[in-house]
C-alpha cells in the first residue's frame, strides 16, 4: 500500500492511498468466485456462470463492494502510518480502479493545526465560597410543600387568582381553523406557571367556574410546534373548576410524606442541606473550570476548518432535539436547524472543540493518563448506564464511542485538577456571589 499526504492548509490534508494490483486482483477474483456460487442465472448451473456473464450483471456491484472494503480496511492504517488525527469523519472521494490494476482513493482529512501552549501553570483563579444558608433550605422546603399540596375545589364562588389551579377545556385556532393537535380537555393549569404560553395564564385570573373566555396570543418563529410557529393563535377556554392549593404543615408527618426514610423534619432538613451543598460544590467546580478555560483560550489561536465547526453544530442541534424527544415532544428539525440558529451556535461550537484540543495538549505534555483503576471505573460506569455486565463492555465495547468519550471526560477532569493545583487561588465572597 502506497500512502502520501498533500498539505492543503494547516488544518486540512489530502490523504492519497493506492492498493497494489496483486492485492486488488485477489480481492476481485474472490468476489467473482463468491458471486458465482451465490447467483442463479437461467441456462447456467450454480458455480458455472462464466465471468463475462457475471460481470455484465454484477460488475459494478462487485467494484463497489471491493472499493468499500478496501477503504474500510486501509483508511485506519493509512491514518496511523501518516500520523494524521482527523477531528471529524473524513470525506473520501476520487476512487479509481486504475489501468495498471491498482485501486486508489483520496480522503480530505480535517486536523488540528500545530500550536504551542505555554503558561498554563500559575493561572489566577478565584474559588467561590461554599456555604448553604438557612434561606436556601427554607426555599427547598417550600418547593416540596408545593409538590405535596392538596388541591381543594373552592367552596365559595371567588374568582381564580395566581397560585390556583384551573381545570379547563381549551381549543386553539390558527388562521381561522381549529388546531386539533393543540386541543385539551380537563387540563389542569396552575395559574402563574405559564406552561401553555407566557400570556395564557393572565387571561384566567378573575375567571369563575362555568365561564368561557376567548383571547389571542402570538407564538415566536422558533416555537416547538411548526403549525403555530410565528402565528397568532386564538384560544377559546372554558373554566370548568377552580381549585386552591393547600400546603401541608412543616412537621414530622410532612417529612415522612416526602420520603418514608425520614422519621423527623430535622432529618429532611439535614438531607436538603447536604444535597444543596453538593450542588454548590459542583457549581463552584464548574465556575473554576470556566475561569481556567477562559485563560487558556486567550493563550492560543487555533484556526479550525469550517467543516469541523459545522459537525459540532450538528451535534449540538442533535442533542437539543434528543432532549425534547426524551420529554415526549416531537419537534420539527427544520425549525432548529436554520442558518440563523446555526450561526448563533457556531461560537459555542468552536469553543467546545478548542476546549477539547487544549486539554488534550496539556494531558499529553504533562503525561496525564488514566490509571488501571480509573479505566476499570469507566467500564463499570458504562456497564451501569447500558445495563450490561462489565465483562461484556470490556470484550465487546472497549473501543466504542461511549467508552472513549467517558475516558476522555475523565482525563479532562484530571487536567483541570492539575491546573487548579498549579494555580494561584483567591476566594469569592458570598456577597460577590449574590451580586
Swiss-Prot record:
The UniProt record lists the keyword Transmembrane: no
Entry keyword Isomerase: yes
Organism this protein belongs to: Syntrophobacter fumaroxidans (strain DSM 10017 / MPOB)
Reaction catalysis annotation: [protein]-peptidylproline (omega=180) = [protein]-peptidylproline (omega=0)
NCBIfam families, sorted: tig
An annotated GO BP: cell division
Keywords assigned: Cell cycle, Cell division, Chaperone, Cytoplasm, Isomerase, Rotamase
Domain PPIase FKBP-type: 163-248
Main subcellular location: cytoplasm
EC number(s) on file: 5.2.1.8
UniProt lineage: Bacteria, Pseudomonadati, Thermodesulfobacteriota, Syntrophobacteria, Syntrophobacterales
Family designation: Belongs to the FKBP-type PPIase family. Tig subfamily.
Domain of life of the source: Bacteria
Record's GO cellular component terms: cytoplasm
Domain remarks: Consists of 3 domains; the N-terminus binds the ribosome, the middle domain has PPIase activity, while the C-terminus has intrinsic chaperone activity on its own.
Enzyme type, top EC level: isomerase
Molecular functions (GO terms): peptidyl-prolyl cis-trans isomerase activity; protein folding chaperone; ribosome binding
Function: Involved in protein export. Acts as a chaperone by maintaining the newly synthesized protein in an open conformation. Functions as a peptidyl-prolyl cis-trans isomerase.
Name the record gives this protein: Trigger factor
Cellular compartment(s): Cytoplasm
Gene: tig
Amino acid at each position: 500500500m502506497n500512502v502520501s499526504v498533500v498539505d492543503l492548509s494547516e488544518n486540512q490534508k489530502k490523504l492519497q492511498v493506492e492498493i497494489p494490483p496483486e492485492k486488488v486482483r485477489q480481492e476481485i477474483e474472490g468476489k467473482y468466485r463468491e458471486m458465482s456460487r451465490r447467483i442463479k442465472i437461467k441456462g447456467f448451473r450454480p458455480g458455472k456462470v462464466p465471468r463475462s456473464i457475471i460481470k455484465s450483471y454484477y460488475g459494478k456491484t462487485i467494484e463497489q463492494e471491493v472499493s468499500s472494503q478496501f477503504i474500510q480496511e486501509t483508511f485506519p492504517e493509512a491514518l496511523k502510518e501518516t500520523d494524521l488525527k482527523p477531528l471529524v469523519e473524513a470525506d473520501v472521494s476520487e476512487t479509481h480502479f486504475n489501468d495498471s490494476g491498482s485501486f486508489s482513493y483520496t480522503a480530505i482529512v480535517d486536523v488540528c493545526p500545530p500550536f504551542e501552549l505555554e503558561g498554563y501553570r500559575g493561572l489566577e483563579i478565584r474559588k467561590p465560597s461554599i456555604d448553604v444558608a438557612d434561606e436556601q433550605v427554607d426555599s427547598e422546603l417550600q418547593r416540596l410543600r408545593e409538590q405535596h399540596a392538596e388541591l381543594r375545589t373552592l367552596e365559595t364562588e371567588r374568582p381564580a387568582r395566581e397560585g390556583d389551579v384551573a381545570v379547563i377545556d381549551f381549543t386553539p385556532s390558527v388562521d381561522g381553523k381549529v388546531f386539533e393537535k393543540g386541543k385539551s380537555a380537563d387540563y389542569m393549569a396552575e395559574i402563574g406557571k405559564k406552561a401553555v404560553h407566557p400570556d395564557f395564564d393572565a387571561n384566567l385570573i378573575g375567571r369563575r367556574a362555568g365561564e368561557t373566555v376567548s383571547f389571542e396570543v402570538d407564538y415566536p418563529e422558533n416555537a416547538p410546534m411548526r403549525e403555530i410557529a410565528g402565528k397568532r393563535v386564538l384560544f377559546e377556554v372554558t373554566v370548568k373548576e377552580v381549585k386552591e392549593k393547600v400546603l401541608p404543615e412543616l412537621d414530622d408527618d410532612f417529612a415522612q410524606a416526602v420520603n418514608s426514610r425520614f422519621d423527623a423534619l430535622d432529618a429532611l432538613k439535614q438531607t436538603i442541606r447536604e444535597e444543596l451543598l453538593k450542588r454548590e460544590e459542583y457549581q463552584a467546580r464548574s465556575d473554576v473550570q470556566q475561569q481556567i478555560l477562559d485563560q487558556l483560550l486567550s493563550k492560543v489561536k487555533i484556526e479550525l476548518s469550517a467543516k469541523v465547526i459545522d459537525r459540532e453544530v450538528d451535534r449540538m442541534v442533535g442533542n437539543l432535539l434528543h432532549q425534547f424527544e426524551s420529554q415526549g415532544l416531537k419537534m420539527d428539525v427544520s425549525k432548529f436547524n436554520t442558518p440563523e440558529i446555526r450561526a448563533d451556535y457556531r461560537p459555542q461550537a468552536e469553543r467546545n472543540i478548542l476546549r477539547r484540543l487544549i486539554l488534550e495538549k496539556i494531558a499529553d505534555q504533562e503525561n496525564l493518563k488514566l490509571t488501571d483503576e480509573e479505566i476499570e471505573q469507566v467500564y463499570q460506569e458504562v456497564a451501569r448506564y447500558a445495563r450490561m455486565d462489565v465483562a461484556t463492555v470490556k470484550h465487546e465495547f472497549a473501543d466504542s464511542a461511549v467508552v472513549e468519550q467517558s475516558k476522555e471526560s475523565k482525563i479532562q477532569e484530571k487536567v483541570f485538577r492539575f491546573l487548579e493545583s498549579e494555580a494561584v487561588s483567591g476566594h469569592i465572597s458570598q456577597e460577590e456571589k449574590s451580586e
